[in-house]
C-alpha cells in the first residue's frame, strides 16, 4: 500500500483546464500557437482572403482530449500572464449545453468590440445563425477568433488537433502526481502502479480518447490504494 500526505490528485479541482501544462508531441509551443493568433495584427501580415481566413482558428478534438486546457493556456499567453485565471479575468468565454446562449452571445460580441482576439471554449454550443453573426462581426474589425470544437467549424482553419496517446497519458499523470511524497519508491512508483493497474486499463478501454473521464475514474482507485490522505473531494 502506497502512503501519501497529499489529498487525492484526481479530485476535480486538480483537473480544471490550465492546471496541467498542455503536452506537445514535438517542438511546438504555446508561444508559437499564440503567434498564429497574433499574426494578422502585426506588421507584414498578408492581405486579402488568406489573411481573413487566418483570423478564424479552431482547436479540434474529441471530448476530454485537452482542447480546453490548450485554449486556457493560449489565453494566458496572449494576455502575457501565464498565472492568470482566464475565467475570472474574462479572458475567454466558456460555453456548456446549459449556458444561456443569448447572454453568451452578448458577452462574445462585447469582446469582439473591444479586444484584438476572442477565445471561445465550446463553439458548437452557439446556434449556427449566431456563428454567422460572430464571423460577420469580427471580420471587418480584424478580430481573431480562436475556438474549441469537436469538428472543424465552417469558415475556420485548424490551429491544433488534440490527440491522446501513451506519451500524453504519462505526461498528465506525472504532472498530477508531481507532489506526491510516497514512501514506497516516490512518485515514479505511484505512476508505475497506476499505469499498470487493471483499473486504469479498464478505464482507458471504456473512455478511449476521453482522458479526462479516465482521470476522474481514478479517484476511487487512489482512495482504495493510497493511505493517509484527506478523504474529501
Language-model regions: role of each:
Residues 51-72:
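Walker A/P-loop nucleotide-binding motif
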Residues 192-233:
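Amphipathic alpha-helical "lid/sensor" segments that cap RecA-like P-loop NTPase cores
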Residues 165-197:
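Conserved small helical "lid"/interfacial subdomain of P-loop NTPases
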Residues 72-79:
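A conserved segment at the C-terminal end of the G1
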Residues 1-53, 217-233:
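A short, basic N-terminal segment
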Residues 81-113:
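AAA+/P-loop NTPase substrate/partner-engagement loops
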Residues 152-164:
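Short regulatory helix/loop adjacent to the ATP-binding pocket of P-loop NTPases
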Residues 98, 108-137, 144, 148-151:
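Conserved P-loop NTPase "ATPase switch" module shared by AAA+ and STAND
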